[in-house]
Amino acid sequence: MSHNDTIVAQATPPGRGGVGILRISGLKARDVAQEVLGKLPKPRHADYLPFKDVDGSALDQGIALWFPGPNSFTGEDVLELQGHGGPVILDLLLKRILTLPGVRIARPGEFSERAFLNDKLDLAQAEAIADLIDASSEQAARSALNSLQGAFSARVNHLVEALTHLRIYVEAAIDFPDEEIDFLSDGKIEAQLNGVIADLDAVRTEARQGSLLREGMKVVIAGRPNAGKSSLLNALAGREAAIVTDIAGTTRDVLREHIHIDGMPLHIIDTAGLRDASDEVERIGIERAWQEIEQADRVLFMVDGTTTDAVDPADIWPDFIARLPKNLPITVVRNKADITGETLGISEVNGHSLVRLSARTGEGVDVLRNHLKQSMGFDTNMEGGFLARRRHLQALAEAAEHLEQGKAQLLGAWAGELLAEELRLAQQSLSEITGEFTSDDLLGRIFSSFCIGK
């Protein structure tokens, strides 16, 4: 589809509401105003007008806002019609606008895409619009707004600028080898490179925090039947999300709860008790449990403290530990401390965290909450943070790898040409975040995930 078309879409959620907004952007927006309103409203002023059908009869009446380009969200002429939020009324008005030549329904995210293409915002800011809409906590919303206002982009642009200056210095050393000063060995380039690496590490740390705020952590509760997995899910969720009985195998499918710990999203998954089951339904539930375990960020290995004194997971259930994916973090949770009389709290056992608690009474659950937050490195006190996506983390990691490779070339062989190439690749990776260097394929995937009307 052409970006020269004029596009229209409903900017408010579908369904009934007090207000319904249609947004129009493009060369024909002026014609839409003349046809539907009978006049062109004063720029950036609210005008209360009837919205007219083809025969001149009123379909609705409301507020019209006119934003002539380039001083608009998309950089094009933009008209917003704010009428009553009834689905029938909005549908009639939308059909009326689509009778005009050169006007079509917008694709999901096309308004934001046009804003990006017209340099009204960069790609990280455009993504922040969707993240702000999807924010699941106050902290996530504030961080998304910071990204929208350019906080993340400013940090990335600072790195790109520093790399640009460093590349100039390195390439000057390559192009003018006969100068009296040996630019590659006088220590200045190494010092500048170390400075960029340190700045990039700081941005990566903040980006990981932003990714946690956006993506959250997937925690799977696993263990034998009747270990108290569902009771722990209920304790963490603060409500009776799962049925709890003394009958082994009560939970036969995956149960999911979404909670927040000091702003960090946590996806808690309760699974069927793991054992050799003859019942077909229970067997399917156990297989699904293993599928969830394999995709987890952390596993809470639930142990009934009344059945064993062991604390090392390899001693408690070696077959379970052997089947777990390599490098998957495990927290051993010894449950039923209210019965065993164990001291509540957290300790380390052979590289694994061990938490003693009572899921039934809730004693020790706060210790587990703090452990989950700390295990992901989540900092609740970070001010002015920004949200980050997985593609951002990947781009930052690639840039860091190129800088380390470049440093190795500099220190190992004084290879200026190879250092210059690694600096170029690092700069390219960073530019993918803001969209200065991005494939059309990636743009399509990003903007297609947006709401229609955004």
UniProtKB/Swiss-Prot annotation:
Binding residue positions for K(+): N226, T245, I247, T250
Domain TrmE-type G, residue spans: 216-377
Compartment list: Cytoplasm
A GO term from the CC aspect: cytosol
Cofactor note: Binds 1 potassium ion per subunit.
Protein family per UniProt: Belongs to the TRAFAC class TrmE-Era-EngA-EngB-Septin-like GTPase superfamily. TrmE GTPase family.
Function: Exhibits a very high intrinsic GTPase hydrolysis rate. Involved in the addition of a carboxymethylaminomethyl (cmnm) group at the wobble position (U34) of certain tRNAs, forming tRNA-cmnm(5)s(2)U34.
Name of the protein in its database record: tRNA modification GTPase MnmE
Organism listed in the record: Salmonella gallinarum (strain 287/91 / NCTC 13346)
Record lineage: Bacteria, Pseudomonadati, Pseudomonadota, Gammaproteobacteria, Enterobacterales
